[in-house]
Amino acid sequence: MNLHEYQAKQLFARYGLPAPVGYACTTPREAEEAASKIGAGPWVVKCQVHAGGRGKAGGVKVVNSKEDIRAFAENWLGKRLVTYQTDANGQPVNQILVEAATDIAKELYLGAVVDRSSRRVVFMASTEGGVEIEKVAEETPQLIHKVALDPLTGPMPYQGRELAFKLGLEGKLVQQFTKIFMGLATIFLERDLALIEINPLVITKQGDLICLDGKLGADGNALFRQLDLREMRDQSQEDPREAQAAQWELNYVALDGNIGCMVNGAGLAMGTMDIVKLHGGEPANFLDVGGGATKERVTEAFKIILSDDKVKVVLVNIFGGIVRCDLIADGIIGAVAEVGVNVPVVVRLEGNNAELGAKKLADSGLNIIAAKGLTDAAQQVVAAVEGK
Protein backbone atom coordinates (compact mmCIF):
# COMPACT_ATOMS: atom_id res chain seq x y z
CA MET A 1 0.00 0.00 0.00
CA ASN A 2 1.45 3.35 -1.06
CA LEU A 3 1.14 6.65 0.79
CA HIS A 4 0.92 10.15 -0.62
CA GLU A 5 3.85 12.53 -0.29
CA TYR A 6 2.05 14.66 2.30
CA GLN A 7 1.30 11.55 4.37
CA ALA A 8 4.95 10.49 4.20
CA LYS A 9 6.01 13.93 5.41
CA GLN A 10 3.53 13.75 8.28
CA LEU A 11 5.31 10.57 9.38
CA PHE A 12 8.68 12.25 8.93
CA ALA A 13 7.54 15.04 11.26
CA ARG A 14 6.51 12.54 13.95
CA TYR A 15 10.00 11.07 13.87
CA GLY A 16 11.74 14.45 13.94
CA LEU A 17 12.96 14.49 10.34
CA PRO A 18 13.35 17.85 8.55
CA ALA A 19 10.82 18.58 5.80
CA PRO A 20 9.30 21.77 4.34
CA VAL A 21 6.21 23.21 6.03
CA GLY A 22 3.21 22.24 3.93
CA TYR A 23 -0.52 21.51 3.86
CA ALA A 24 -2.64 19.12 1.80
CA CYS A 25 -5.61 20.93 0.24
CA THR A 26 -8.78 19.77 -1.48
CA THR A 27 -10.08 23.14 -2.76
CA PRO A 28 -8.52 26.24 -4.34
CA ARG A 29 -9.57 28.29 -1.31
CA GLU A 30 -7.80 25.88 1.06
CA ALA A 31 -4.70 26.15 -1.11
CA GLU A 32 -4.67 29.94 -0.83
CA GLU A 33 -5.21 29.74 2.93
CA ALA A 34 -2.34 27.26 3.20
CA ALA A 35 -0.03 29.76 1.53
CA SER A 36 -1.05 32.37 4.10
CA LYS A 37 -0.26 29.96 6.95
CA ILE A 38 3.16 29.19 5.49
CA GLY A 39 4.10 32.83 5.03
CA ALA A 40 5.80 34.72 2.24
CA GLY A 41 6.43 32.94 -1.08
CA PRO A 42 7.62 31.49 -3.25
CA TRP A 43 5.71 28.26 -2.73
CA VAL A 44 5.67 24.87 -4.38
CA VAL A 45 2.37 23.23 -5.36
CA LYS A 46 2.28 19.50 -6.05
CA CYS A 47 -0.43 17.16 -7.28
CA GLN A 48 -0.84 14.25 -4.86
CA VAL A 49 -0.97 10.99 -6.82
CA HIS A 50 0.62 7.57 -6.40
CA ALA A 51 3.01 7.96 -9.32
CA GLY A 52 6.39 9.43 -10.14
CA GLY A 53 7.18 11.82 -12.97
CA ARG A 54 4.77 14.48 -11.71
CA GLY A 55 7.10 17.37 -12.49
CA LYS A 56 7.55 16.47 -16.15
CA ALA A 57 3.77 16.11 -16.49
CA GLY A 58 3.09 19.57 -15.07
CA GLY A 59 1.96 18.30 -11.68
CA VAL A 60 4.62 20.22 -9.71
CA LYS A 61 5.14 23.96 -10.00
CA VAL A 62 6.95 26.79 -8.21
CA VAL A 63 4.63 29.80 -7.83
CA ASN A 64 5.11 33.34 -6.57
CA SER A 65 1.54 34.48 -5.96
CA LYS A 66 -1.64 33.19 -4.37
CA GLU A 67 -3.39 33.78 -7.69
CA ASP A 68 -1.03 31.25 -9.28
CA ILE A 69 -1.78 28.80 -6.46
CA ARG A 70 -5.52 29.16 -7.08
CA ALA A 71 -5.03 28.72 -10.83
CA PHE A 72 -2.97 25.57 -10.29
CA ALA A 73 -5.57 24.13 -7.92
CA GLU A 74 -8.46 24.95 -10.25
CA ASN A 75 -6.57 23.38 -13.15
CA TRP A 76 -5.75 20.09 -11.43
CA LEU A 77 -8.22 19.27 -8.65
CA GLY A 78 -10.75 16.78 -9.97
CA LYS A 79 -8.64 16.05 -13.05
CA ARG A 80 -6.35 13.11 -13.83
CA LEU A 81 -2.56 13.35 -14.05
CA VAL A 82 -0.86 11.20 -16.68
CA THR A 83 2.85 10.43 -16.15
CA TYR A 84 5.29 7.86 -17.46
CA GLN A 85 4.39 5.69 -14.45
CA THR A 86 0.61 5.69 -15.03
CA ASP A 87 -1.55 4.23 -17.77
CA ALA A 88 -3.21 6.38 -20.40
CA ASN A 89 -6.03 7.27 -17.99
CA GLY A 90 -3.67 8.65 -15.36
CA GLN A 91 -4.38 9.03 -11.64
CA PRO A 92 -7.08 11.24 -10.09
CA VAL A 93 -5.90 14.43 -8.38
CA ASN A 94 -8.02 14.88 -5.25
CA GLN A 95 -5.49 16.88 -3.23
CA ILE A 96 -2.60 19.21 -3.83
CA LEU A 97 0.26 19.88 -1.44
CA VAL A 98 1.21 23.50 -0.86
CA GLU A 99 4.56 23.98 0.85
CA ALA A 100 7.35 26.51 1.27
CA ALA A 101 9.87 26.60 -1.56
CA THR A 102 13.41 25.48 -0.72
CA ASP A 103 16.66 27.04 -1.94
CA ILE A 104 18.48 24.00 -3.33
CA ALA A 105 22.26 23.78 -3.51
CA LYS A 106 22.57 20.04 -4.19
CA GLU A 107 20.26 17.04 -4.59
CA LEU A 108 20.95 13.62 -3.06
CA TYR A 109 19.08 10.32 -2.90
CA LEU A 110 18.35 8.16 0.14
CA GLY A 111 16.07 5.15 0.22
CA ALA A 112 15.57 1.63 1.55
CA VAL A 113 13.97 -1.59 0.38
CA VAL A 114 13.73 -5.19 1.54
CA ASP A 115 16.50 -6.99 -0.34
CA ARG A 116 15.26 -10.54 -0.88
CA SER A 117 18.69 -11.91 -1.83
CA SER A 118 20.32 -10.87 1.47
CA ARG A 119 17.02 -11.05 3.42
CA ARG A 120 17.76 -7.69 4.99
CA VAL A 121 16.66 -4.10 4.79
CA VAL A 122 19.17 -2.36 2.54
CA PHE A 123 19.69 1.41 2.45
CA MET A 124 20.88 3.07 -0.74
CA ALA A 125 22.35 6.55 -1.09
CA SER A 126 23.58 8.45 -4.11
CA THR A 127 24.81 11.87 -5.15
CA GLU A 128 22.47 11.57 -8.15
CA GLY A 129 19.30 12.84 -6.51
CA GLY A 130 16.26 14.15 -8.35
CA VAL A 131 16.33 11.49 -11.09
CA GLU A 132 14.97 7.95 -11.31
CA ILE A 133 17.21 5.75 -9.17
CA GLU A 134 16.54 2.85 -11.56
CA LYS A 135 18.21 4.86 -14.32
CA VAL A 136 21.22 5.57 -12.10
CA ALA A 137 21.48 1.88 -11.18
CA GLU A 138 21.49 0.93 -14.84
CA GLU A 139 23.84 3.57 -16.22
CA THR A 140 26.17 4.41 -13.31
CA PRO A 141 25.76 1.74 -10.59
CA GLN A 142 29.04 2.80 -8.96
CA LEU A 143 27.29 5.98 -7.81
CA ILE A 144 24.89 4.03 -5.56
CA HIS A 145 26.24 3.21 -2.10
CA LYS A 146 24.59 0.57 0.08
CA VAL A 147 24.48 -0.60 3.69
CA ALA A 148 22.46 -3.54 5.04
CA LEU A 149 20.78 -3.47 8.44
CA ASP A 150 21.59 -6.32 10.78
CA PRO A 151 18.25 -7.73 11.99
CA LEU A 152 19.69 -8.26 15.48
CA THR A 153 21.19 -4.82 16.08
CA GLY A 154 19.04 -2.72 13.76
CA PRO A 155 20.39 0.53 12.28
CA MET A 156 23.68 1.81 13.70
CA PRO A 157 24.89 5.44 13.59
CA TYR A 158 28.22 4.40 12.07
CA GLN A 159 26.33 3.12 9.00
CA GLY A 160 24.81 6.56 8.50
CA ARG A 161 28.23 8.18 8.83
CA GLU A 162 29.67 5.68 6.36
CA LEU A 163 27.07 6.64 3.75
CA ALA A 164 27.55 10.34 4.49
CA PHE A 165 31.30 10.11 3.88
CA LYS A 166 30.74 8.23 0.61
CA LEU A 167 28.44 11.06 -0.49
CA GLY A 168 31.20 13.55 0.23
CA LEU A 169 29.42 15.24 3.12
CA GLU A 170 31.39 17.11 5.76
CA GLY A 171 30.92 18.86 9.09
CA LYS A 172 27.39 19.26 10.41
CA LEU A 173 25.94 17.62 7.28
CA VAL A 174 27.36 14.27 8.41
CA GLN A 175 25.52 14.59 11.72
CA GLN A 176 22.31 15.68 10.01
CA PHE A 177 22.51 12.85 7.47
CA THR A 178 23.10 10.28 10.23
CA LYS A 179 20.03 11.54 12.10
CA ILE A 180 17.91 11.26 8.95
CA PHE A 181 19.30 7.79 8.24
CA MET A 182 18.49 6.58 11.76
CA GLY A 183 15.02 8.14 11.59
CA LEU A 184 14.18 6.55 8.25
CA ALA A 185 15.42 3.17 9.44
CA THR A 186 13.28 3.45 12.56
CA ILE A 187 10.21 4.34 10.48
CA PHE A 188 10.91 1.45 8.11
CA LEU A 189 11.14 -1.13 10.88
CA GLU A 190 8.47 0.17 13.25
CA ARG A 191 5.93 0.77 10.48
CA ASP A 192 6.46 -2.50 8.56
CA LEU A 193 7.39 -0.76 5.32
CA ALA A 194 8.43 -2.35 2.04
CA LEU A 195 9.88 0.86 0.59
CA ILE A 196 10.98 4.27 1.81
CA GLU A 197 12.53 6.90 -0.42
CA ILE A 198 13.60 10.54 -0.26
CA ASN A 199 14.30 11.76 -3.76
CA PRO A 200 15.60 14.34 -3.56
CA LEU A 201 17.19 14.76 -0.15
CA VAL A 202 18.56 18.26 -0.64
CA ILE A 203 21.34 20.38 0.76
CA THR A 204 19.97 23.90 1.04
CA LYS A 205 21.95 27.04 0.28
CA GLN A 206 21.96 27.59 4.04
CA GLY A 207 23.88 24.31 4.44
CA ASP A 208 21.18 22.06 5.90
CA LEU A 209 19.59 18.79 4.79
CA ILE A 210 15.86 18.77 3.98
CA CYS A 211 13.59 15.86 2.96
CA LEU A 212 12.14 17.55 -0.10
CA ASP A 213 10.09 14.56 -1.25
CA GLY A 214 8.85 11.39 0.41
CA LYS A 215 7.66 8.05 -0.90
CA LEU A 216 6.49 5.25 1.40
CA GLY A 217 5.18 1.80 0.58
CA ALA A 218 3.69 -0.25 3.42
CA ASP A 219 3.62 -4.04 3.53
CA GLY A 220 -0.03 -4.90 2.95
CA ASN A 221 0.34 -8.09 4.97
CA ALA A 222 1.21 -6.07 8.08
CA LEU A 223 -1.62 -3.52 7.95
CA PHE A 224 -3.57 -5.44 10.59
CA ARG A 225 -1.09 -4.07 13.15
CA GLN A 226 -0.56 -0.69 11.48
CA LEU A 227 -4.05 0.70 11.90
CA ASP A 228 -3.07 4.34 11.43
CA LEU A 229 -1.37 3.52 8.13
CA ARG A 230 -4.40 1.55 7.00
CA GLU A 231 -6.55 4.63 7.58
CA MET A 232 -4.27 6.56 5.20
CA ARG A 233 -5.14 4.26 2.30
CA ASP A 234 -6.44 6.14 -0.73
CA GLN A 235 -8.46 3.68 -2.80
CA SER A 236 -9.07 6.28 -5.50
CA GLN A 237 -5.43 5.76 -6.50
CA GLU A 238 -5.85 2.00 -6.90
CA ASP A 239 -7.07 0.04 -9.90
CA PRO A 240 -10.75 -0.69 -9.09
CA ARG A 241 -10.33 -4.24 -10.38
CA GLU A 242 -7.42 -4.82 -8.02
CA ALA A 243 -9.46 -3.48 -5.10
CA GLN A 244 -12.40 -5.73 -6.00
CA ALA A 245 -10.07 -8.74 -6.29
CA ALA A 246 -8.61 -8.08 -2.85
CA GLN A 247 -12.09 -8.35 -1.32
CA TRP A 248 -12.26 -11.93 -2.64
CA GLU A 249 -8.66 -12.71 -1.66
CA LEU A 250 -7.67 -12.85 -5.31
CA ASN A 251 -4.24 -11.58 -6.31
CA TYR A 252 -4.86 -9.43 -9.40
CA VAL A 253 -2.55 -7.05 -11.22
CA ALA A 254 -3.73 -5.26 -14.36
CA LEU A 255 -1.43 -5.31 -17.40
CA ASP A 256 -1.61 -3.87 -20.91
CA GLY A 257 -2.39 -6.93 -23.06
CA ASN A 258 -5.58 -8.57 -24.34
CA ILE A 259 -5.31 -12.16 -23.03
CA GLY A 260 -6.97 -12.59 -19.65
CA CYS A 261 -5.23 -15.09 -17.38
CA MET A 262 -6.72 -17.02 -14.45
CA VAL A 263 -4.30 -19.35 -12.68
CA ASN A 264 -3.96 -21.06 -9.30
CA GLY A 265 -0.57 -20.31 -7.79
CA ALA A 266 1.62 -17.24 -8.19
CA GLY A 267 4.55 -19.15 -9.69
CA LEU A 268 2.34 -20.91 -12.23
CA ALA A 269 0.68 -17.57 -13.03
CA MET A 270 4.03 -15.97 -13.84
CA GLY A 271 5.04 -19.02 -15.89
CA THR A 272 1.73 -18.82 -17.76
CA MET A 273 2.34 -15.19 -18.66
CA ASP A 274 5.84 -16.08 -19.83
CA ILE A 275 4.66 -18.79 -22.19
CA VAL A 276 1.87 -16.56 -23.54
CA LYS A 277 4.52 -13.93 -24.32
CA LEU A 278 6.77 -16.61 -25.82
CA HIS A 279 4.05 -17.47 -28.35
CA GLY A 280 3.46 -13.84 -29.29
CA GLY A 281 0.59 -12.98 -26.96
CA GLU A 282 0.20 -10.15 -24.45
CA PRO A 283 -1.28 -10.93 -21.00
CA ALA A 284 -3.99 -8.55 -19.82
CA ASN A 285 -3.44 -9.38 -16.18
CA PHE A 286 -1.85 -11.46 -13.47
CA LEU A 287 -4.54 -13.29 -11.50
CA ASP A 288 -3.88 -15.94 -8.88
CA VAL A 289 -7.08 -17.51 -7.54
CA GLY A 290 -5.07 -19.44 -4.94
CA GLY A 291 -5.63 -22.96 -3.69
CA GLY A 292 -9.29 -22.49 -2.80
CA ALA A 293 -10.59 -21.98 -6.33
CA THR A 294 -14.31 -22.33 -5.53
CA LYS A 295 -17.10 -21.61 -8.00
CA GLU A 296 -17.75 -18.28 -6.28
CA ARG A 297 -14.13 -17.17 -6.54
CA VAL A 298 -13.82 -18.37 -10.13
CA THR A 299 -17.03 -16.49 -10.99
CA GLU A 300 -15.71 -13.32 -9.40
CA ALA A 301 -12.38 -13.80 -11.18
CA PHE A 302 -14.19 -13.99 -14.53
CA LYS A 303 -16.11 -10.81 -13.72
CA ILE A 304 -12.90 -8.97 -12.86
CA ILE A 305 -11.05 -10.17 -15.96
CA LEU A 306 -13.93 -9.37 -18.31
CA SER A 307 -14.42 -5.89 -16.83
CA ASP A 308 -11.29 -5.03 -18.82
CA ASP A 309 -12.56 -4.13 -22.30
CA LYS A 310 -9.21 -5.05 -23.84
CA VAL A 311 -9.64 -8.76 -23.07
CA LYS A 312 -10.31 -10.79 -26.23
CA VAL A 313 -9.80 -14.30 -24.82
CA VAL A 314 -9.42 -15.87 -21.37
CA LEU A 315 -6.84 -18.51 -20.49
CA VAL A 316 -7.57 -20.62 -17.41
CA ASN A 317 -4.56 -22.66 -16.26
CA ILE A 318 -5.19 -24.90 -13.25
CA PHE A 319 -2.88 -27.44 -11.65
CA GLY A 320 -4.86 -29.78 -9.44
CA GLY A 321 -2.78 -30.61 -6.42
CA ILE A 322 -4.88 -30.11 -3.32
CA VAL A 323 -7.90 -29.08 -5.38
CA ARG A 324 -9.58 -31.55 -7.78
CA CYS A 325 -9.73 -30.56 -11.45
CA ASP A 326 -13.28 -31.91 -11.87
CA LEU A 327 -14.48 -29.54 -9.15
CA ILE A 328 -12.61 -26.70 -10.84
CA ALA A 329 -14.31 -27.64 -14.11
CA ASP A 330 -17.71 -27.43 -12.39
CA GLY A 331 -16.76 -24.00 -11.12
CA ILE A 332 -15.63 -22.82 -14.56
CA ILE A 333 -18.81 -24.13 -16.23
CA GLY A 334 -21.00 -22.48 -13.61
CA ALA A 335 -19.08 -19.23 -13.80
CA VAL A 336 -19.17 -19.05 -17.61
CA ALA A 337 -22.90 -19.78 -17.60
CA GLU A 338 -23.61 -17.21 -14.87
CA VAL A 339 -21.39 -14.39 -16.12
CA GLY A 340 -22.32 -14.84 -19.77
CA VAL A 341 -18.79 -14.87 -21.13
CA ASN A 342 -18.79 -13.70 -24.75
CA VAL A 343 -15.11 -14.27 -25.52
CA PRO A 344 -13.36 -17.62 -26.12
CA VAL A 345 -12.24 -19.42 -22.96
CA VAL A 346 -9.26 -21.78 -23.18
CA VAL A 347 -8.81 -24.11 -20.20
CA ARG A 348 -5.78 -26.21 -19.35
CA LEU A 349 -6.25 -28.67 -16.50
CA GLU A 350 -3.44 -30.81 -15.12
CA GLY A 351 -3.19 -33.03 -12.07
CA ASN A 352 -5.83 -34.50 -9.78
CA ASN A 353 -8.85 -35.71 -11.86
CA ALA A 354 -7.70 -33.68 -14.89
CA GLU A 355 -9.22 -36.09 -17.43
CA LEU A 356 -12.60 -36.03 -15.73
CA GLY A 357 -12.45 -32.24 -15.60
CA ALA A 358 -11.62 -32.01 -19.31
CA LYS A 359 -14.55 -34.31 -20.14
CA LYS A 360 -16.94 -32.14 -18.16
CA LEU A 361 -15.75 -29.07 -20.07
CA ALA A 362 -16.17 -30.84 -23.41
CA ASP A 363 -19.70 -32.00 -22.52
CA SER A 364 -20.82 -28.60 -21.20
CA GLY A 365 -21.90 -27.24 -24.57
CA LEU A 366 -20.35 -23.87 -23.70
CA ASN A 367 -17.72 -21.95 -25.66
CA ILE A 368 -14.88 -23.54 -23.69
CA ILE A 369 -11.81 -24.96 -25.39
CA ALA A 370 -10.02 -27.74 -23.49
CA ALA A 371 -6.27 -27.48 -24.16
CA LYS A 372 -4.07 -30.57 -24.25
CA GLY A 373 -1.17 -28.91 -22.48
CA LEU A 374 0.29 -25.54 -21.55
CA THR A 375 1.96 -25.02 -24.93
CA ASP A 376 -1.27 -25.92 -26.70
CA ALA A 377 -3.18 -23.53 -24.42
CA ALA A 378 -0.83 -20.65 -25.25
CA GLN A 379 -1.10 -21.37 -28.97
CA GLN A 380 -4.90 -21.55 -28.73
CA VAL A 381 -5.30 -18.18 -26.99
CA VAL A 382 -2.90 -16.42 -29.35
CA ALA A 383 -4.75 -17.91 -32.33
CA ALA A 384 -8.08 -16.79 -30.84
CA VAL A 385 -6.82 -13.22 -30.46
CA GLU A 386 -5.63 -13.24 -34.07
CA GLY A 387 -9.01 -14.56 -35.21
CA LYS A 388 -7.66 -17.89 -36.43
UniProtKB/Swiss-Prot annotation:
Annotated binding of ATP, by residue: K46, G53, R54, G55, E99, T102, E107
Domain ATP-grasp: from-to ranges: 9-244
Residue ranges of the TM segments: none
Keywords associated with the record: ATP-binding, Ligase, Magnesium, Metal-binding, Nucleotide-binding, Tricarboxylic acid cycle
Residues engaged in binding substrate: N264, G321, I322, V323
Cofactor: Mg(2+)
GO molecular function: ATP binding; magnesium ion binding; succinate-CoA ligase (ADP-forming) activity; succinate-CoA ligase (GDP-forming) activity
Quaternary structure note: Heterotetramer of two alpha and two beta subunits.
Name listed for the protein in its UniProt record: Succinate--CoA ligase [ADP-forming] subunit beta
Gene: sucC
